[in-house]
């Protein structure tokens, strides 16, 4: 058995190491600076209680982006020096963020060990490569991201750090070969176990979904399927789940070989960046893939926690997706057969889920943006299904959003709706059919998001200030609105969203400005990133339509009057100098 020594390395604080819920994300060249990664890792160890470090088991893996392998070798050496008993690493450093959450919660080592936390190496949907982004975040023993109480401690520690211990003579660990490597250190034995990236996650998915019914759907000649991993870590699971377990043809997988630079692309599953899938599904305005599009398509981001769902020539909004999953979960997904504990969405997400909750008599929660708020509700047994408009959907099986889970949920719903079709020769119920039937039952929430990026920070704050000031006089607001578009409904209430967590009582203020209309429509304004590169203003526009004869309109056409009201009420062009947004979703 190879032995190692521990040495103390002197260091000094490095500015700008403040982690968010999504951890610390910077350019690779920043992480490669002397002591940059080491300082942050040690600051994290110092923020944890002793029993979470000494003698503990930690998971260290990520989405496989550039610099991951070097980072893992450094973290392993520091874990050994800090008295960690064992480190679990996904083969070739690959573990999706949802899989890490599942492994913390579910995996038991051969010696009975359970993980107390994880370092996840990802910058999510940000590009990867030598000149692009790297990231690191810490997840706790519940499988969820570190709460602010921990991330605040980490940040404080980065401002005072003077030294860190490291086992510099620990040999490089071969993370490409499955097995356990044991070492002997000053505090005793230290193991590094490299294991199959997919086994634990696949086992969990098979306990949630009826794989046989999905397999039957995928084998049906008229049902075609396409999945695009955008060269992210989802590729490590896609072949195993969709091809080996469910019998889909290999040709149904796009970009499913994980690459450290994501093939030079932007691993963000939306209509802009998942170009190849969008073209194949018949939704591209410029690129025709040729042939008949598949019936179902889906994409993932770099670390596989986000998802985009598509039908043939049909886009499912994330807001509709979570509502449809919640409405069909009990009948279509065995895990939910005894009922849902509750549902939740982030505040900017459309109110489609609210209508489902009201109709089905479910507990409903509206939370600020950030998955940790869902995690609190789930830990307390109050929420089963949740989602956000930024392509994140999940359930209480783990404490992260889960892209492949969302795909399997949709395939389960399709299999459930097509039971009779698969047994006979009836017409296939499509993704579009399911969405339109949902709208016919619950009404449609027309929805769009306008992003104004790199706006002057002062001007952005002034715009938000105007919107807060207007809220003090709703008669004046309604007078302005009638002058812009008389047919738009009156504003019933307006506020700045504030959330009191029903679990721990914590209060989150200034989470966005809301204008709520009498007909269920909403305008939401949020400000983010007031840094040196300016601010981003996000404008969310939503209109509720119950009239079945009006639910088939083009979204931008239906929202036209409300968009006009939002832009003129906020004086968007006057404050920003922009005649159009940077991005429309």
Swiss-Prot record:
CC cofactor: Mg(2+)
Role, per record: Catalyzes the reversible isomerization of alpha-D-glucose 1-phosphate to alpha-D-glucose 6-phosphate. The mechanism proceeds via the intermediate compound alpha-D-glucose 1,6-bisphosphate. This enzyme participates in both the breakdown and synthesis of glucose.
Disordered: annotated segments: 1-20
Subcellular location: Cytoplasm
EC class name: isomerase
Gene3D superfamilies: Alpha-D-Glucose-1,6-Bisphosphate, subunit A, domain 3, Alpha-D-phosphohexomutase, C-terminal domain
EC numbers for this chain: 5.4.2.2
Biological processes, Gene Ontology terms: glucose metabolic process
Residues reported in the UniProt entry to bind alpha-D-glucose 1,6-bisphosphate: 25, 124, 305-306, 369, 388, 390, 401
Phosphoserine modified-residue sites: 124
NCBIfam families: PRK07564.1-1
Superkingdom of the organism of origin: Eukaryota
Organism: Arabidopsis thaliana (Mouse-ear cress)
Subunit and interaction comment: Monomer.
Name the UniProt record assigns to this protein: Probable phosphoglucomutase, cytoplasmic 2
Sample GO molecular function, one term: phosphoglucomutase activity
Reactions this protein catalyses: alpha-D-glucose 1-phosphate = alpha-D-glucose 6-phosphate; O-phospho-L-seryl-[protein] + alpha-D-glucose 1-phosphate = alpha-D-glucose 1,6-bisphosphate + L-seryl-[protein]; alpha-D-glucose 1,6-bisphosphate + L-seryl-[protein] = O-phospho-L-seryl-[protein] + alpha-D-glucose 6-phosphate
């Amino acid at each position: 058995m190879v032995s190692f020594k521990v040495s103390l390395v002197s260091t000094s604080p490095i500015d700008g190491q403040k982690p968010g819920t999504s951890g610390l994300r910077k350019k690779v060249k920043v992480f490669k600076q002397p002591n940059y990664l080491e300082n942050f890792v040690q600051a994290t160890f110092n923020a944890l209680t002793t029993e979470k470090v000494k003698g503990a088991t930690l998971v260290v893996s990520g989405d496989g982006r550039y610099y991951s392998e070097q980072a893992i070798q450094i973290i392993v050496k520091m874990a050994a020096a800090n008295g960690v008993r064992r480190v679990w690493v996904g083969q070739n450093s690959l573990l999706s963020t949802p899989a890490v959450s599942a492994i913390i919660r579910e995996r038991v080592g051969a010696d009975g060990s359970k993980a107390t936390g994880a370092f996840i190496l990802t910058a999510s949907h940000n590009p990867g490569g030598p000149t692009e982004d790297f990231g690191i975040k810490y997840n706790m023993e519940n499988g969820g991201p570190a709460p602010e109480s921990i991330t605040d401690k980490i940040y404080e520690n980065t401002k005072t750090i003077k030294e860190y211990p490291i086992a510099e003579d620990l040999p490089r660990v071969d993370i490409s070969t499955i097995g356990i490597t044991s070492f002997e250190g000053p505090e005793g034995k230290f193991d590094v176990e490299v294991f199959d990236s997919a086994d634990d996650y696949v086992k969990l998915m098979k306990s949630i979904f009826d794989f046989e019914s999905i397999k039957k759907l995928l084998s049906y000649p008229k049902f075609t399927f396409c999945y695009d991993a955008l060269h992210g870590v989802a590729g490590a699971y896609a072949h195993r789940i969709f091809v080996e377990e469910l019998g889909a043809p290999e040709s149904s997988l796009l970009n499913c070989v994980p690459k450290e630079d994501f093939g030079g692309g932007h691993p963000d599953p939306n209509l802009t960046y998942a170009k190849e899938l969008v073209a194949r599904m018949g939704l591209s305005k410029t690129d025709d893939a040729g042939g008949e599009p598949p019936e179902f398509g889906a994409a993932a981001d770099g670390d596989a926690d986000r998802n985009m769902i598509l039908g043939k020539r049909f886009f499912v909004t994330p807001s509709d997706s979570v509502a449809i999953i919640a409405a069909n979960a009990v009948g279509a997904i065995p895990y939910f057969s005894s009922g849902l504990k509750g549902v939740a969405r982030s505040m900017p997400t459309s109110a489609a889920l609210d209508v489902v909750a009201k109709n089905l008599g479910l507990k409903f929660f509206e939370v600020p943006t950030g998955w940790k708020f869902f995690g609190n509700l789930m830990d307390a047994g109050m929420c089963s299904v949740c989602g956000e408009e930024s392509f994140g959907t999940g359930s209480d099986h783990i404490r992260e959003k889960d892209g492949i889970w969302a795909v399997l949920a949709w395939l389960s719903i399709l299999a459930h709706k097509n039971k009779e079709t698969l047994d006979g020769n009836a017409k296939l119920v499509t993704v579009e059919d399911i969405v339109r039937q949902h709208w016919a039952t619950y009404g449609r929430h027309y929805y769009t998001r306008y992003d104004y990026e790199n706006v002057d920070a002062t001007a952005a704050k002034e715009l938000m200030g105007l919107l807060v000031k207007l809220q003090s006089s709703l008669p004046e607001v309604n007078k302005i609105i009638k002058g812009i578009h008389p047919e738009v409904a009156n504003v019933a209430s307006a506020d700045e969203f504030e959330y009191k967590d029903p679990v721990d009582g914590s209060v989150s203020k200034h989470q966005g400005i809301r204008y709520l209309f009498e007909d269920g429509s909403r305008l939401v304004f949020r400000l983010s990133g007031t840094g040196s590169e300016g601010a981003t203003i996000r404008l969310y526009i939503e209109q509720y339509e119950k009239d079945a004869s009006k639910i088939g309109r083009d979204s931008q056409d239906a929202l036209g009057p409300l968009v006009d009201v939002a832009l003129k009420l906020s004086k968007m062009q006057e404050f920003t100098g922009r005649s159009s947004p940077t991005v429309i979703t």
